[in-house]
Amino acid sequence: MFQGETAITLDDKGRMVVPAVYRDLIARMSANRLVLTYNPFEAGCLWLYVEKEWERVRDELMVKPNAHRVVRVLQQKLVGSSALLELDANGRISVPSSHRSAVAIGKKAVLLGMGDKFELWSEQAHHALIQQTLSDGDLGDGLLDLRL
């Protein structure tokens, strides 16, 4: 579905242009709506879902028993802090300041298409992740059977 890396600039109001290559697909799949939430695994990164995929993720998470602290924290971080965003006539979404400041996204960001969702990274965090990945000689046994 979504793939690729795009350098993004946010304006003073926190608006970013969604790359044109994705707009038609988002319009068809989600009536120009995206759901923004925190990435619970990576600092400096937000997730953007089309509405239908978000509903699947949300529903799967919310049926988990929240008596377990880790489940409750995930529910709070992903569902409780989510924001419904709508593309405007210029193909822009407005990223809430609370989300931008929490992950240190300023004027420059990176949008990654990750199949069923997007990752929106602060430019600095994405650069650090790439440097760490490139310098990490051991990517783990999980990649041994992957044909690249």
Swiss-Prot record:
UniProt-listed InterPro entries: MraZ (IPR003444), MraZ_C (IPR035644), MraZ_dom (IPR020603), MraZ_N (IPR035642), MraZ_sf (IPR038619), SpoVT-AbrB_dom (IPR007159), SpoVT-AbrB_sf (IPR037914)
Start and end residues of each SpoVT-AbrB domain: 5-53, 82-125
Pfam family, one: MraZ
Primary site of residence: cytoplasm
GO molecular function: DNA-binding transcription factor activity; transcription cis-regulatory region binding
CDD domains: MraZ_C (cd16321), MraZ_N (cd16320)
Keyword Iron-sulfur: no
Compartments (UniProt record): Cytoplasm, Nucleoid
Similarity comment text for this entry: Belongs to the MraZ family.
Subunit description: Forms oligomers.
PANTHER family named among the record's database cross-references: TRANSCRIPTIONAL REGULATOR MRAZ
Protein name listed in UniProt: Transcriptional regulator MraZ
